[in-house]
Amino acid sequence: TREVDTRLKKAAEKDHVVAMYELGLFAFEQGRMEDSKKWYAKAAERGHTTAMNNLANIYSKEGNEKEAIKFYLKAAEKSNPLALFNVGNYYEGNKNIKVAKQYYSKVLHVLKEYPDILKEYSASDLETETMNRLLYLEKNFDEDAETE
């Protein structure tokens, strides 16, 4: 593990974005949240959408919703299905059902449009959960009564 960490750091120093992401993941798995945030942020700055989503997850767990939604939205803008789902969750939690449904629909669109993504994101579970959220919202909320 120390050897892996050293190799990844050398690659990251050469601006290798996947190495930065992996360092963030490695630090997260070891419970080193500040290191994890640092490496995820570096990868996110270079456009790595899963790093953006994971960084947002950390901010969310810390109670920093402002930073969390900022990074979820950045990743969602690049069609990251996990981030799209998380933005949908954010809006659902804030009772903005119309916008939540739009984001959940985008998840399904991305998964349909890019079937290879299913492998990368274990997206069959994501697809099922997204459909469940949409069905729940359709069944339990009157869209006309919602604010945008």
Model regions and ranges:
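Short helix-capping/linker turns of helical repeat alpha-solenoids
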Residues: 14-16, 46-48, 78-80, 110-113, ...
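Terminal, low-structured helical/coil segments at or just beyond the last alpha-helical repeat
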Residues: 111-148
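Conserved alpha-helical positions within TPR/SEL1-like repeat arrays
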Residues: 18-25, 50-57, 82-89, 132
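TPR/TPR-like (Sel1-like) alpha-helical repeat modules
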Residues: 76-79, 97-115, 135
